[in-house]
Amino acid sequence: MECKRARAYSSSANLGSGFDILSIAHTAFFDTVEICVENKNLNNIIVESNSKIPLEPNKNSATYPIVKIMEEIGIKASLKVRVIKGIPEGLGLGSSGASAAAAVMAFNNLFNLNLSKEDLVRYAMYGEIASSGSPHPDNVAASVFGGVVSVVSVSPVKVVEIPINYSFDILLFTPLNVHIEEKTKKAREMVPKTVTLSDYINNSRYISSLLLGFIKGERELIRLGLNDKIVEKARLPLFPYYPKIKEVAIKYDAIGACVSGAGPSILVLTDKMTDENKIVEEGTKTCNEFNVECKVIKAKIAGGVGIEGRD
């Protein structure tokens, strides 16, 4: 029985004003997906997992992309798919996107399809449909490519890897006792359909500043860029502790802070100028004031999805 196993890292989407556009892959957590071919004369998928995820292929973020690849390319096979979840679900850390990215990578390698990275993203987006009903590309793009990415088009899929010329670390405040049913779907429904011209202009300035800051290696541009006037404000009821954690982060000279994806996790970028210990101490105290138990994870930028066991 031939098997392939792939690993994809967690990610934080949006990075302030880059809703559905920007995302960063980080080493905080990872998911692993193993796919084995049991019979090439049958056509079914059996799902196993260490987590309570849907076992029906069309409702599973790892296997629905595989179903779509098999349909489009015309592959017939009986598969056993084992999804090993390492990324906590519902915390805005790209859990479903990483599973989808790992699955399409393992399947691509198993059947020697030679799909491009952008094709992997296109298929992995079906995993987001299975998870939340929306094919948002930002998390899957980060998990596939690694680093910081910008999704500049979804039809066709076009992803640009952003050069990072400033060294930074990552702190993630991850709430342990916050559970929001169908969180991603609910959070997307909170995003306003129309915005004021002034908010649009400010957000355009922020995203420009962030990208230029990464490319030019300018700390103050990155700090300015990690702001948002639209989506974070609309979703604030989901993470009321965020403004104060951001205030603490800036007080102790973090580069900046933003909500990780749809939340409730908070992403803080730090460097040698930052007092990380104070941010962790006071940020955790802030969480407690809101009756939220936060675990703080330190991470770095992660690479893209890869096959495990390859020399």
From Swiss-Prot:
Localisation: Cytoplasm
Residues where ATP binds: 88-98
Known catalytic reactions: L-homoserine + ATP = O-phospho-L-homoserine + ADP + H(+)
Keywords: Amino-acid biosynthesis, ATP-binding, Cytoplasm, Kinase, Nucleotide-binding, Threonine biosynthesis, Transferase
Statement: the UniProt record of this protein carries the keyword Ion transport: no
Annotated InterPro entries: GHMP_kinase_C_dom, GHMP_kinase_C_sf, GHMP_kinase_N_dom, GHMP_knse_ATP-bd_CS, Homoserine_kinase, Ribosomal_Su5_D2-typ_SF, Ribsml_uS5_D2-typ_fold_subgr
This protein's pathway: Amino-acid biosynthesis; L-threonine biosynthesis; L-threonine from L-aspartate: step 4/5
Highest taxon above the source species: Archaea
Record GO biological process: threonine biosynthetic process
GO molecular function, a single term: homoserine kinase activity
Keyword Ribonucleoprotein: no
Matches recorded under Gene3D superfamilies: 3.30.230.10, GHMP kinase, C-terminal domain
HAMAP family linked: Homoser_kinase (MF_00384)
Function: Catalyzes the ATP-dependent phosphorylation of L-homoserine to L-homoserine phosphate.
Protein name from the UniProt record: Homoserine kinase
Species this chain originates from: Saccharolobus solfataricus (strain ATCC 35092 / DSM 1617 / JCM 11322 / P2) (Sulfolobus solfataricus)
Gene name for this UniProt entry: thrB
